[in-house]
């Protein structure tokens, strides 16, 4: 089972702590972190996410859009620490012969960090980035010469959207219930209208669109959005959608 706030409180009773599942789709906050973020039993849950509760009290566990929403409010590490960690990770990838890497979810908060990496010449590997709507908009403004082409080892490749979660966390959106479940099939993180709007946006800007869709219900939602957009005249070949 997942740990909860009580588990983390025993390890860190005073300091705010958040741990992330290896999939990136869920995580746990301790009591100090929940208090710092203002999360209570009355906190509204973002659509397409889960704030775990027990008897009306947050357990610290969150999934999908809920976890992503509160995770991005956690303060970033100091810039120098980030740059040092990035250089070490880059060297590790290069040691295995990897020369191109992907930033699979470029959020707006990460754009200043990439500006710093480019400013001091830290990028040695080619990085292709795919952002959510806000992240891609910010990156287009910050790196106009890097849209769809490499400039100083950085390229803004297009958009990324998430239509469901992860199978290992049992949040991937399925057509049939999970094993051992009567009805639970996971859930989608976007409405049909939101998915279609993102396809239209990528098509209008001739930007590639990468869609995270693990479950077959999420895959069907993405295909339906692409089919609708194609009927409306969106040039899918030009945007090169990826599932």
Language-model segments: which ranges?
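Catalytic pocket of metal/acid-base enzymes, prominently hydrolases
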Residues: 2-129, 150-203
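Distinct, well-ordered alpha-helical segments
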Residues: 112-116, 139-145, 219-232
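Glycine-rich phosphate/ribose-binding loops and adjacent secondary-structure elements
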Residues: 200, 206-208, 223-228
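Hydrophobic/aromatic residues located in beta-strands of well-ordered beta-sheets
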Residues: 17, 127, 209, 241-243
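Short acidic/histidine-rich active-site segments
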Residues: 167, 207-217
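Acidic-and-aromatic substrate-binding clefts and catalytic sites of carbohydrate-active enzymes
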Residues: 104-110, 134-136, 217-219
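Short helix-capping segments at alpha-helix termini
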Residues: 119-124, 149, 229-238
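Hydrophobic, small-residue-rich alpha-helical packing segments that form membrane-like cores
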Residues: 135-140, 156
């Amino acid at each position: 089972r997942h740990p909860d706030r009580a588990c983390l409180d025993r390890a860190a009773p005073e300091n705010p702590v958040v741990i992330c599942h290896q999939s990136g789709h869920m995580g746990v906050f301790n009591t100090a972190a929940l208090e710092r973020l203002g999360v209570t039993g009355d906190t509204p849950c973002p659509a397409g996410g889960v704030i775990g509760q027990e008897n009306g009290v947050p357990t610290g566990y969150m999934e999908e859009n809920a976890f992503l929403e509160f995770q991005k409010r956690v303060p970033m590490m100091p810039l120098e620490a980030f740059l040092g960690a990035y250089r070490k990770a880059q060297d590790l990838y290069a040691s295995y012969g990897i020369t191109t890497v992907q930033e699979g979810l470029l959020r707006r908060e990460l754009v200043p960090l990439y500006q710093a990496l480019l400013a001091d010449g830290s990028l040695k590997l080619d990085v292709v980035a795919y952002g959510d709507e806000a992240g891609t908009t910010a990156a287009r403004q910050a790196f106009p010469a890097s849209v769809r082409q490499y400039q100083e080892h950085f390229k803004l490749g297009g958009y990324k959207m998430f239509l469901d979660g992860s199978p290992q966390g049992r949040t991937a959106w399925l057509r049939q219930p999970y094993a051992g479940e009567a009805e639970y099939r996971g859930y989608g993180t976007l409405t049909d209208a939101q998915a279609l709007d993102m396809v239209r946006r990528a098509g209008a800007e001739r930007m590639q669109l990468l869609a995270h869709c693990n479950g077959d219900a999420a895959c069907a939602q993405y295909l339906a959005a692409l089919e609708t957009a194609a009927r409306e005249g969106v040039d899918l070949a030009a945007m090169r959608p990826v599932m």
